[in-house]
Amino acid sequence: MAPASTVELSPGEPLRVAARRVIAARSEDLAAIAPGAVGSSDPEALHDVRVAVRRLTSALDVFADGLEEDARRRARRMLRRDAEPLGRARDLDVQIALVRRFLKGARTSDQAGISHVLAVLASERAEAEAEVKSAIAALADPELRAALDEVAAT
């Protein structure tokens, strides 16, 4: 999992200032990680994007009292909508890894059936890649960036 960038906060820092700094950092983390997930053979790249989105939405929630509510809700809603297709692809990645482990230890008589399941999952994952590309593009969309900038500016 990609580490989040560190944001040093001080106890006397106003909530709005801290919120802006943390949201900006989480937004930059997402922007840096997301492009690497498109077409990656490493399923952890997609997982890292999902974690970065969760960190950003969590920051929006944690600092809610220091942010303009309508702008915060709009940005959060856009993030969740744009990242939703990543969940299906990640689920398939996890299932494929699990079935591959089963296949390695399977009896010869079971291998054909397990291989078929693996092929079906791999096909579904290949189809999901188009949704991953669209989701990553949406997470880099200027409209979302503007919504996050609006939250950080309030």
Predicted regions and their residues:
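Function-determining surface determinants
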Residues: 1-154
